[in-house]
Amino acid sequence: VAAIDWLGREVRCPGAASLLAMTAASACGYCEPMRQTTGFARLPDGERIAFAVVGSGPAVVLPAWWVSNMVEDWQFDPLRRFVEGLAAGRMVVRYDRLGTGLSDRERPPETFTPEFEDATLCAVLDELGLVRMTLMGISCGGCTAVSFAARRPERVDRLVLYGSYAQGHALGPPQARTGMVDLVRSHWGLGSRLLADMFGPNWSAEDRVAFTASQRAAADAEVAADLLALIYETDVRDDLPGIRAPALVVHREHDRAMRLSGAREVAALLPHADLVTLPGDAHLPWHGDGDAVLRAIAPFLGIEGPPAPANGADADALGELSAREREVLGLVAQGLSDPQIAERLVLSPHTVHRHVANILAKLRLPTRAAAAAAAARAGLL
């Protein structure tokens, strides 16, 4: 009850943004679609860790941020476009923690430690033969990146921390943290919905359903609860001052899963760090305006970021839409919901939801309202 009461104060009512639909097709706004390859690394005791690689060049490694599935997550167009943006001249590596996704699902309780997270990252790097790399720690993956950079400075070229924190105890009152872990363990369905509300307070109902389902498919209740407990117990404040690598800390101003105050603490403790704050409240970088996150980190990584549209969607971007997508966009601009559009066009709501997500991705727009405005400017009404 304490966790639910606290979370109720932390999140807003969900809005109409449609940012999470799953789709089999993807096209990057400023590069050709890329192919993801997958493989397995082995831990010292033989457990398999699934990893995925996109692109080529100097390595950018993303430590596991929450529960995940390398293949299923790749079907989410916003995530795919974000990773493709990072992979412009770089090799991007992601992996599933033990107990999640395509990695072996059996995970003993004693492995839920920062040391085991570090060992998992090392196993993936060794399997790929990576000696030196850039680490990009997203959410709780930031703590793994910090720990690794502090203990193996010779292997880390640069450090990017997005949506990160230094001490898990600062993420909520003790009773709320304990209550949230207990809720996830005993009622993973409700717990996953509450976490979705925190990760994306302005997601549409369809987006929350999709993300909730992806969490439950990626890990069972015990693993999710133990990982959440690990997040709350992790403290890397002592590691931060000793990191020699240049660092960039990026955070959205109204992130409710990881507060901006946590990012400020991280940046203050790092000796060679810059802090960049961005508008928005979505916790993961590929939700909301993912291109803005890429533009913020591109100069630091030495890659070409996505272009900044002068006035939102332009004529060229509208030209990327299929005939069906232009038809759906016109109905969105008229204020119709996904179920209403589905009924009008004799499509399933899921298909409409996928079309809307593709429209937002192609137009590089964050919300249905912005897409409606673009449709009006283009004369689609």
Where are these regions (language model features)?
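Catalytic active-site module of serine/aspartate enzymes centered on a nucleophile-bearing elbow/loop
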Residues: 273-312
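Conserved alpha/beta-hydrolase "acid-adjacent" motif
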Residues: 256-262
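Flexible "cap/lid" loop of the alpha/beta hydrolase fold
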Residues: 146, 150, 156-186
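Short beta-strand/loop motif that positions the catalytic acidic residue
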Residues: 243, 249-251
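Helix-turn-helix DNA-binding segment
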Residues: 309-357, 361-363, 370-373, 377-380
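Conserved alpha/beta-hydrolase catalytic His-Asp/Glu region
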Residues: 171, 189-234, 238-239
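Conserved acidic catalytic loop of the alpha/beta-hydrolase fold
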Residues: 115-133
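Conserved HGGG/HGGXW glycine-rich cap/lid loop of the alpha/beta-hydrolase fold
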Residues: 40-104
